[in-house]
Every structure is written in structure tokens, then in C-alpha cells.
Amino acid sequence: MDTSYYNRFGAEELARRLSNETLLAQGPMGSVLLSEYDAADIPPAFWNLAEPQTVSRIHRLYVAAGAQVLITNTFQASSYALKHDQIAPSVAEVNRGAVDDARQAHPQLLLGSMGPIGIEWFAEDSAEYREIRGIAREQAHALLNAGVDGLLIETVTSIRNLQPMLAGARDAADGMPVLVSFVVDDKGDLLGDGLNIEAAVLYAEKHGANSVGVNCCSLAAANAAVPRMVASATTPVTVRPNVGDPVQTQDGPVWHENPEAFARACIEWRHAGAAMVGSCCGTTAITTAAMAEALDI
């Protein structure tokens, strides 16, 4: 596997800043496309090549709002997801398109998003486990080869969900940062299997994660998890909750954004020791701007 195009300088800068600052990450891409661009029947990854100017515009809005870290529009851009969504271009093309779209916004730092693959597996020597690991390796290499500063395996609901994905990402990483982000319940434990967050942190770090965090959970869940993660982690902690489930209307899903609540919460997360804060589904650049103002960015 050729790693000569990996962005080593960007990786070093990401590691340095995660260790010394509280960075502000962008908000979501998928829910913005869904709510503002009437994209209910269009997979987000499709936009990377078909409507790159739209993806870049959303990234630019986040940068203008104060985001220091952008996240590629590749949450569902593995070969498995592209086949499911009937997207013809290759994994390399779609992921490079997403990286190029994000780079058009001139971010300070750029993470490559990798979401759940959706294949069940039962044993580490099974064909299914090897398939997931290979799919993750392929997407990780595509993102790194396109120039991201690090990988972000996000919306992880269980250790079982994480195992082959982290292994595959590490196969491709060759020393590049791999960040892991879990979904937790309101007690701060993993949503999918109920494992306590301390054990999840231990597993992720033991198997090579360079950062641990939570995303796509409620504010209450994030508030419960962050102090526990900071206390148990030896790597930087990240936090990016959502605003809850949308209300279904005739015009599609509507989220009730609460920028003030996120602005207040991000101060608490910084005080608790979080290295990167942001927001997930249902928020927009309005929330990012409120957080940037609260953090004096």
C-alpha cells in the first residue's frame, strides 16, 4: 500500500493542536443537505462529485462561522455504502472528491469521516469480519491518500461495531492519526451494548486510537460522558452531540436548533478537558458560530 502521499505535516499539526487547545469542529453535513437542499432521496456521498459546489459551500459556511476542523462528507462512502446507494464512481473517486470539496474551504485541519459499515460478524476469523476490515482499510487509504490530516471513525454504538473498522483503519494508517467517536446514552455508556464508557475508552486506546470521543448523542449524554472520558483517557477527548430527533413535517424533517445550549455546554466541555468540541445532526453553522463566540475563537 503506497503511503507516500499521506499528509504527514497535517497529522503532526493535528496531534499538536489536540494536545494543546480546545478545537472547534464543524457541524453536520447530512442533516444540512436533508433539511436545506431537499435531499431526502439523494445519498450524501453522491453530492461529492455531482454537486461539489454545494458541499464546498456548506464547508465554507462552517469555516466562516469559526470552525477550525472540517470533517469530510464521507460518513457513508465505503464500498459497501456506495454499492447500497447505487453510486457508480469508485471509493477512491468519491472520497477524493469529498476531500477536494472540503479543501476548497481552506480549513485549518481536515478529518476523514468513516461511518458504520453495517455488516454483521460473529468471529474474528470469519469472512464477514475480514470483509469489514478490508472495506474500512480501503476507505481509510482513499481518505489518507487524498490528503486528510487524520481519520475519524464516528457514530460507533458498540465495541463489536468498532473492532474490524479500527483494525482496518489502522492497517492503512501507517502512523497517521485515527480518532474514534462513540454514541452514548444519557448515562454516558455505549448505546448499542451498554458497555461503560471507561471500558470503551480502554479498548479503543489499547487498539491504536489516537483520540476518543462521543458524537450524535444528546447534550445530556455528552455532559455525562465527557468528564468520565477525560478521567479515564490517555488521549485527547472529543465531543459533538446532536439536537435530538427531528419533527416530521410535510416539507420534510425539521430539527429544533438550540445554539445557546451548545454555547453554554462547550464552555463546560472545555473546562472538563475536551480537546475538540462541535455539533452533530440537526445543527447548522448558526450553532458553530455560537460556540465559536463562547470559546472566543
Predicted regions mapped to residue ranges:
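Domain-level signal for soluble alpha/beta catalytic cores
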Residues: 1-297
